[in-house]
Amino acid sequence: MSKVLIEEQSDQGMAKRIINHSGLSVGQLVTKHGSGNIDKLIPKLSRTTASNPWVVFRDSDTRCPVELREQLTKSTTVNPAFLLRIVHPMTEGWLMADPQSFSQYFKITAKKVPVDTELLPHAKHSLLALCKKSRSRDIRGDIVRPDGSTGPLYVSRINEFAENYWDIATAAQNSPSLNRALVRLAELRSFLMNQ
């Protein structure tokens, strides 16, 4: 069982789904409400042991994932029981990288879903803008308020989509950062099984 650290509650479905898809299980899911709170914990978590593995999902917020990872881990040593995955640009981008399932669930024309979600300046804003034009009144009301901010059921709808409808394999074909995360999670699983 892995402990998993995420930024926001709306990342829970994505994290659980990816961990389970990778053949691992979530022992504890911790939400830290913002990347700054996660960044402070990375040096400590990176010293974990195989009996207490940690997986951290942190949004890149449009920064170069490679440079961000180097900055966040420069004072740590490589530890195979610790995995930091940079979600590029953010969770909503990974979810939209499966345009077929995304368009069906959120009742949006598939051709309106961005092809390369890693190029979006702000994936969450893009998702909200798409959902504002949903054919479903329920989706519009749940996901986005009239002023464009997140709606009252944003978190539960995003998590429901991630856990039950999101096709990770399709999304990984469209999102290099998601594909890399799956590769690293497979390596973590292999390491833990050999301990």
Predicted regions and their residues:
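C-terminal accessory helical subdomains adjacent to catalytic cores in phosphodiester-
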Residues: 2, 12-28, 39-55, 60-195
